[in-house]
Amino acid sequence: MPAILQLRLTTLLPQARRFTRPAFRLPILPSNAFIRLSSTLPAARKLDLVDLDKKWQAKWQLDAAMTQAKAELGPESKPKSYILSMFPYPSGTLHMGHLRVYTISDVISRFYKMRGHDVLHPMGWDAFGLPAENAAIERGVDPAVWTEQNIAKMKEQLRKVSVEFDWDRELATCDPDFYEHTQWIFLMLYKKGLAYQAEALVNYDPVDKTVLANEQVDANGFSWRSGAKVEKLNLKQWFFRITAFKEMLLKDLDSLTGGWPERVLSMQRNWLGKSHGARVTFTVAAGSQDDKGVNVNVFTTRPDTLYGVEYLALSLDHPIVTKAAQNDLALRKFLDEASSLPPDSKAGYCLNGIVASHPLQSIDSTSHHLTRKLPVFVAPYVLSDYGEGAVMGVPGHDSRDMAFFKENVNPETISLVIQPEPVNARGIEAADTVIPAREAKAFTQDGFLTPLCGKYKGLHSKDAAQKIVADLEEIKKAEFVETWRLRDWLISRQRYWGAPIPIIHCGDCGPVPVPVEDLPVKLPKIEGEWLKGKKGNPLESSEKWLHTKCPSCGGPAKRDTDTMDTFVDSSWYYLRFLDPANKESPFSSHLARPVNVYIGGVEHAILHLLYARFIYKFLAQSDLFPAIANPENLKVPAEPFQTLLSQGMVHGKTFTEPSTGRFLLPTEVDITSPDKPLIKGTQVTPNVSFEKMSKSKHNGVDPTLCTAKYGADATRAHVLFSAPVSEVLEWDEAKIVGIERWLSRLWKLVFDAQRNLADCSFTIQSADLDSAGHAVSLSSVQGLSDSDADAILATHNTIVSVTTCIESNPYGLNTVISDLIKLTNTLSSAPPSSPLVLYLSISSLLRMLAPIAPAIASESWEVLHESLKDPTPSAPTPSIHASPWPTSILTNEQCDAISARGGQTVAVQINGKLRCAVTIPHMPEKTTTPQGKGQTQEEQEWIISRILETAEGKVWLQEKNDWGKRKRVIIVKGGKLVNVVF
């Protein structure tokens, strides 16, 4: 066995002390630092996690240090971290999704506090909106009263899951002190021409009786909230001109790479929808020779397919359609029915006597099929706000067009004008590109133009597109253009429970902004018939509130009765947390800053996150951000959220009756044997699956019931351990027993350690507990016993792994739990014999546990230090949550020295022939291994470098072979065999 080198550890304290028996000393811990359990050494008490919750939650609630208000995030020397979870709608009940997101944010927040950061971790309430209004109507109460009651309930529920928020910064979007500034931001946008009112065809929810943004209508045309079939109406609405920021919103996504999930970035890019193509002009006319027709512009990203156009399709509200409907009863009937069809419907109506002329016939007289008159259809799949409400149909090269054409024309053949191979490659003739319709499949890739394409035959798609558009441009039939999917943000809602739009309508002056000094425009108190279920907007009938004077001329005027979309509130709330008591402005300019880590569901990838980016970029150009008021001076793009954690959903265990598919109540299933559930009464085995939690599936789980049964610590740890943050969490309550067993082992470990430390009179200065990453330091690794060496190495590796995960890869928080379980098992199976190593290992384990399971960590910390006495205490002992995060214990050399005990034998082959066997140190194990098989590049290099240090390795790899000319190195069987190929 090679001798362990005498390696000194890096000093961990300003005055590091050598601990030698019997000189271990500790001060008596102040009584206000730890609650003493008894005057004698305790026996291991039975672990009661629920009782620990009650004790420590009550203590934290009274602890001024835990709730001390910070006047502002000032220019202190501490690094600052802003950790924020997406604030909830106050429904009155926490669900498992809430528990997951707030546990994640709480762990990260507590971690950075222990790392010495000035951490902002606030909580607020997304309190406006339809759910609160509808719930209040159902109950006959004021939405403000109902919301306030729910907030109080949810605050208590959050306290019971041991999450620590900066409650002194709490806000609710329905508070006039908050929405005063929402209205101010509206006026800032209005002043810049970015808030405007316009007549528009809008999405109207007939159940909730309000307008919806495009993003709030699903792919099948249903409301995201009520589930009602959305209607299309022409109404005057308020918009934010988000399209003015479209280039910035797209370009700056690149700066978020690495900080945001690629999936979310892709979703935003797709929603912004920048595309390059051409605007092509078709002439549409009635069949008579007297009708010269009108120009209809279509946008296409594939002008190379123009020779394959078989029809034009118009939107339901296109002017040509509207005019034709005046004299076509069947068309009017189709339009009535089509408004309820899904956007992907293949239904169509061919306009009688209306045809289109192909623009290419003006420049290509040899392709006779271009002279055909093209039918013109009305189709629900054509969006009125895409291009100009018209599209060209190319069945041979678009799957949707193919399906529509077959449905409405029933053609015998389909023409292909693009082929994957050049025309001359295999002698393709024009006849070869006309395919029977029943056999035809759309070819949607780039390729080469076929003989049907006249003078463009044989050109590649990209070249043909350029040439065709250029030729049509000369006769003013086409031009290259850029289009976006993004539309301006419709923000007005015809409901009561929202921030009133601060505009007054005057008969003489038109719309006039409310003066800033008159903000907030408060909601009037409602009562009477509306609270009994009357539909519509009560602001329209609140006479005293509605009628006012014009701020401009002083004449009679009316307030705008629309309220703002709740996404306006959430587009800036994170900035208000920075300065929640500011009466003069939304926030002080010197406090403006982005969120460091933002946690929330991927379902907000388009709506909330896109709107928040827009508003932040707008505000960054205002006087509220004076340091970066000029975008040209920005060193980095103005983005509100530097790192985004998108957690997966929580699915619940679902039981269904096999023969009927009926969802079963949990009370209908006998789970005496969890692995073999049976339906009560029939004793039939139900189908078991994990699905999104919902009342209809009877698979919802109340997190407060879990914490009442198992304790908050076990519930939190189980939530983290069950799945990586980004993945769906399949909640299985039966498996929480594994977490309970781990915490019980840890509990016993702490009591055993406390007794052993007391027996050897181990002492520690209480002031040292908050001075560095460790209260004591190890002077040397020489002479460590096997159990001490294993313990100190395992502790060191766990500290490195857990710290790296939370800092650099918080999506892997499940591995943090597994790392702590492994360390607990190592210390339990072979307890360290050295008091110093024992204390270092146990205290480090508890500090790493503190963000995850705060109550048992606090109690265990108290137990561990109970009998560590120092007769002259110099400072109160901090709680574990105020103690520093543990730092690395060993250097790389020390890790190698400890790992080398005994060594490992490696067989070395050269070109497949065994040449020698060498002994090298054990490779330091990484506590959390990367996914996949085999060694990482770093591990391979470590093994090779150790082989080259041996005498045999030098002879065979350097002297007898030229190591520099090696072709490859293959390492297998965990490093036991190395094959070098020269």
Residues covered by each model-derived region:
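Non-catalytic terminal extensions that flank enzyme cores
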Residues: M1-T93, E231, L249-L250, P261-S275, ...
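NTP-handling and nucleic-acid-processing catalytic cores
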Residues: A3, R45-K59, Y179-P411, V417, ...
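Conserved oxyanion/phosphate-binding beta-strand-loop segments in alpha/beta enzyme cores
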Residues: S39-L84, K113-P122, W146-K153, F334-F377, ...
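Residue patterns forming the tRNA-binding/recognition surfaces of aminoacyl-tRNA synthetases
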Residues: K46, K59-D63, T67, E138-V296, ...
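N-terminal catalytic cores of NTP/NDP-binding nucleotidyl/phosphoryl-transfer enzymes
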Residues: A71-V141, A172-I185, T300-T301, H368-F404, ...
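Glycine-rich phosphate/pyrophosphate-binding loops
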Residues: S109-A132, E310, I354, H358-K441, ...
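Acidic, turn-prone loop/beta-hairpin segments
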Residues: D126, I503-G507, V514, L644, ...
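Long, charged, mostly alpha-helical binding arms that flank functional sites
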Residues: L130, G277-R279, P422-Q466, A470, ...
